[in-house]
Structure formats: structure tokens, C-alpha cells
């Protein structure tokens, strides 16, 4: 339904935030018409500058709809709303005075109590490892290159101190606790280099059964301790094949999805490289409502990678052509594959997702630590989380 994430939903959230006690102030410094007129009026406080307009329909539409001729000021001007309708709380002469009024109003709010986990905030310490190294360590090609994830974490957390959980088990996911801007946090990150587990090599960026088990337990531990979780994505998905199925990848993957879905502590997600398919979901992707979802400029974000998607779509289209009697030759298939791949690659670009609000912000690597700390600052103002309930777990 086209309104699902548009104005109707915005109005709904306006009202819900008010019910939660979140202060909302608005300043009208221009024209607010139709749906845009409801937003400021649903706020706690409304400031309006002289010469601005606020109406459900402008003068031209009013004349067309009911034949009434009226000036903009008489219909919905600032003075009219201040003196006649009583809609405006504060009338100001210009933008500068309106902004100053907002500052004074904001200063009058009592400080909000912080969430329990935020009361344990300590003095922030810069990472011991140089943050400037991040640009050289992080992927520049959407996550296909291997790298040591611990080196990334060391350049984000306070003092580069990271207390790893089950470090020698399920090693394609790195879990542990640290401090970020003084706040206690849990971290779940995809390991991008090849690791050895029980004598066998495991591909970086892939979630194996044991890693899913470990991460599910760690997410529950963070909820038990009441601390936020930061997810660092660079994931191709869950491992497939005979060995993986016999290891219970579906059951154990479902356990991780369950734990993340029902987690009640704040979750922040960052797409460092690629984030694809069910791996994206398990790492607290957009559908799992993280408080913030950031991405680096080189990030890639889709159901699957470009090559795999193009091959799948090509197979479907080739089968359709064959059924219609038009058996394609190799050159035709190659041309079709390249056209599909190029189109899919454009959609993989993080700017494509950002333009559709699939991520909250595209962040430069050197700004990532600060963005995460600011996000935690915002999360700290939230109320205490409800009790954790996870339903039935596959064991």
C-alpha cells in the first residue's frame, strides 16, 4: 500500500511519540499545506513566523473546490492562526526569532532520566589503534576482499579494549563486549578472513551453524545484562551444503533470528562491506528494526550479490525463451547476462538504498565511531526496555 511508510504513517508516529512523552516542537517558516499542515499542529508546541501560511488547501484550490476567493493571509496566515483560530502558540516576526524561541523552549524541558545501561557510562577513551587506519583496512569493493575484523573493532572501541566471547568457537562471527564513548556495548561482527575450525577451513563473511549458535547466546546475554548491541555487517549469508545441513544450520540460524527479533535492548547496525539475504536479517537488518542503520560509502546491500542474482534471473529468462521456442545462443545469453548484472549492480550501490531510506545515513569511515556514540546518546534517553520474551527456541 503506497501510504504504508508515507504521510499516514508519519502522522501515526507523531501521535505515538507524543503518547510516549517525547517532546515535539515545530516552527513554520514558510508554507505548510495539505498533509504537511497536520505535522506541526500535532506537536506539543507550534511557532510560526509572520508571512507564513498554514492551511489544508491553498487559495487556488479553495477557489477551484468551493468557488471562494480569499487571500493567503485570511485563509491561513500566521496572524490569523495566532488571533482567530488559536492554532499557533507563538507568533514570531522572522526565522531568527523563531529559532531563538525554540532554543528557549527546549532549555525549559527537564533532563530526561537515562536508561539503566547508560548510567554505567564512564569517561570516553580514544582507541589505542589509529582510527585513520580504518580507510586502509575496510573493504572498497563491497565486501569481497578478506580482512581481520578484530582490527576494525580495535579502531572503533574505547582504548581498543575488546573482551571476546567464545573466541575459539563459531569463529566466522566475532562477539564480545567493549565500551564506546564510555557506554557498555556488545558487538557482533562478521569475520571476513578465512578461519580454521576443528581442522576445516571456513569462509569469511559466511555464518556457519556454530557461529549462529554462539551469536544467539551472546545476544541473549546482552539482553540479560541490559546493554546495547552493535552489529557490524559484512555477510554473504548462511552456509549451505550437506555438512551445513547436517550441522543443523536451519535450526541454529532460526535460533539467531529469534534472538535478534525479540531482543529488547537498543541495536545499532553498520554495513561495512556487503550485506546480503538472510545474513542481513540475522545481523539485525532493516526489517528487524535496529534503532539506527548506518552504511559506509562502499557498502553493498541486497538479497544476493550481483553475479548470483544475474545468473539466477538469466536461468529463469532463458527457460522462458526456450518454452516459447526461441532457444537463445551463447552470445545472446552472454549479452543478456551482462545487461541483467549491470542493472542489478546499480541497485546494489548503497546510494540506491539510501535514496529509498533503507539506511539512516551513509557514513565516512573516520566518522563512524562518533556516529555510533551519538546514536548511543540518543538511545540512552529511551525508557527502560520491557522484559525479554523469546517464545519457542529450536534446540
Label for each model-derived stretch:
Residues 1-395:
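Ligand-binding clefts of soluble mixed alpha/beta catalytic domains
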